[in-house]
Amino acid sequence: MKRNTPFSKSCLALIILFGILPAFGSAAGVQANQQTAPALKEIQVPVIHVKGSHYEAGYQIGTQLKKNFLQEVGEMKEDPNWKKIRAEAELYLAYSRKYLPEYVAEAQGTADAVGLGLEDLFPTLCEELWDENYRFTKGCSDLIASNDVTADGSVLAAHNNDTSPSTQELVTIIHYQVDGEPEIVTVGYGGLGISVGYNSAGISLTGNQVDSTDMRVGVPRLLLVRKILAARTIGQAIDAAILKERASDYNQVITDRNGEIYSIEGSATDYAPLYSTEGYLVHTNHYLAPWMRKFEFDPQGITSSIVRYNRGVRLLKNNRGRITVDLLKQFLSDHVNYPGSICRHGNYVKTTFSVIINLTTGTMLLARGNPCEVKYNEYKLISRKEN
């Protein structure tokens, strides 16, 4: 079985969990390491608005992003193993119909709008089947700060998303107003796969790709992401992240506007619910919980993740009580261990978008590209906050 697939979500979720991690003894007020750069560029990101039933929302996504879907499926069909991948994806589809039928309805709506069969479109949601060199394979960094450690009492979720440079032009915001769900704002790469998001109930999802040894046939992890973002409580979000019938999992970083922060380190058959006891959390692309380390697919290939994680912990720990949106922008632009830094650079993989979600105000800052080079634009898409 191949590994990783389109819209995959490996990310540096710099998760800081004291009680699991050793303390870092460094002077307070550690500053981000930034290289001198020219004036920041202004880059706009397209916003897609969808509403109605799940099928209708999917149909609207397909209508507005038809070109992207046709290109993505066309590229998949060029794979010499396409027939095998398509057949295996039908097994994942059967699980999804049984356990998350509402999101299969969304995918069906998209397929109908684009003029594809669902069996041809659904493999774009089954990253478990794809090679690790696929361009949407990711590495990411998360730095989360609760109201206990920010300067103004805001709850802030910061995230860098690292993929192939060729995906940067595809970065798209989708604003969902789906019947029976909270309003949801997501960022992804112009398809059904979601990298990060938040909702009107005050739940955000960021996180990181972790590659485990126990992938299996089941509900694709990209559908877990969609279900998490429909949650109205952090408990519901965690339940969605650990669906028993999952094919694999990410490290799901789930935060609520009360300042509760969990990192759900998952594989197909196990998970570790890591909780932030110090008011902040960092995670990247490797397992932290001792009992999850046996699932690490490539223990020799996580050096960048280890460095990014420890760097993120140090930056947040030593700035407790002073953390602001502007300071997080600096942290997300950090170049320690360049090019494999929090702000990642390179021809194979780079930071293709950077986001800071303010769960207190219900707003999002997004920069398409490296945050050391591109301005953040603010988006206020949530029309109402739920209690």
State each model region's role.
Residues E127-L222, D239, T352-I356, M364-L366, ...:
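Internal mixed beta-strand/loop scaffold within catalytic domains of large alpha/beta enzymes
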Residues C11-A23:
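Bacterial N-terminal signal peptides
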Residues K2-A13:
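Bacterial N-terminal signal peptides that target proteins for export
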Residues A28-G139, L229-N387:
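C-terminus-biased signal that marks the final domain/tail of proteins
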Residues E88-A89, V217-L224, R293:
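Flexible glycine/proline-enriched surface loops and loop-helix/loop-strand junctions
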Residues P6-S8, F24, K51:
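Intrinsically disordered, low-complexity segments
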